[in-house]
Amino acid sequence: MNIVFMGTPDFAVPSLQRMIKEYNVTAILTQPDKPKGRGKKMAYSAVKEEGLKHEIPIYQPIKLKDDRDLIEKLKELKPDFIIVVAFGQILTKEVLDIPKYGCINLHASLLPMYRGAAPLNWAIINGEKSSGNTTMLMDVGLDTGDMILKDEVEITNNMTTGELHDILMVRGADLLVKSIEGISKGDIVPEKQGNETFYAKMLDKNIANIDWNKSAEEIHNLVRGLNPWPIAYTDYKNERMKIYETEVLKEKSNKEPGTIIDVSKNGVKVSCKEDVLLIKRVQFPNGKPLTIEQYINGHEIEENIILQ
């Protein structure tokens, strides 16, 4: 079975590894190298790093739809499938029509819910109790193709986007193999998607500023959903305090939302519109993330300050 693989971030790496193990991967497409870090050195994508270990031809089109030479090369390869995992470019009908059986995309949501760029973040921000992966036969729409298989996982009360990402990253590779086998053997008939959806738009940093006039649970979900990026924050005495870990306490407070009502080694209690939020791990400017117990060992957090 000849496979062309298209993907870019670390989420796609286990799927690429599995494709290399099970099939004949004839080409890898990934996004161009990008400047990274303070030194702005050019960095390879995670998929390129993995592909180089296996001496598979790697192509990095700026825009695949405009790269005639590469499109012709893909046609010459005559792949049975093109497998797409977080590639970062939309495929034209011309490219979608190249493989014998079609293009399969692994998407990290239970479609049709959470189409779009940030499905894991939004599922947690919205307080969903489950998420998962869906494989689909791609069409020209954005995450609208006919569904092949789904794999559902529980979102536990304190799970972060990073933790959910790492679970689905590994499980997605298995789902792709089952999908490839099912489609190529004719054992699976893809199913059309319904219209009910929540569009998981790309995150921007503005969402990270905590509104204390929300319930403790809503804020807890925001903190989980924005970890590991961009990290929810609030202002403490004109200093930005990034918040990495919280817990909802079913307690009442008559203080204004955002007021620090108690500080102990267990955490910082903050009044919310509903219930109380316990802040357990924070980061201040020029510091590293610390538990509250670690932080108050050398610094003070005052009660009755209102977080902004």
From Swiss-Prot:
What's one GO MF term for it?
Answer: methionyl-tRNA formyltransferase activity
EC numbers listed for it are: 2.1.2.9
Top enzyme class: transferase
Which Gene3D superfamilies does the record associate with it? Formyl transferase, C-terminal domain, Formyl transferase, N-terminal domain
What the entry lists under CDD domains is as follows:
FMT_core_Met-tRNA-FMT_N (cd08646), Met_tRNA_FMT_C (cd08704)
Name assigned to this protein: Methionyl-tRNA formyltransferase
Record's function text: Attaches a formyl group to the free amino group of methionyl-tRNA(fMet). The formyl group appears to play a dual role in the initiator identity of N-formylmethionyl-tRNA by promoting its recognition by IF2 and preventing the misappropriation of this tRNA by the elongation apparatus.
State the InterPro entries in the record.
Answer: Fmt (IPR005794), Formyl_trans_C (IPR005793), Formyl_trans_C_sf (IPR037022), Formyl_transf_N (IPR002376), Formyl_transf_N_sf (IPR036477), Formyl_transferase-like_C_sf (IPR011034), GART_AS (IPR001555), Met-tRNA-FMT_C (IPR044135)
Its gene is: fmt
Q: A Gene Ontology CC term for this entry?
A: cytosol
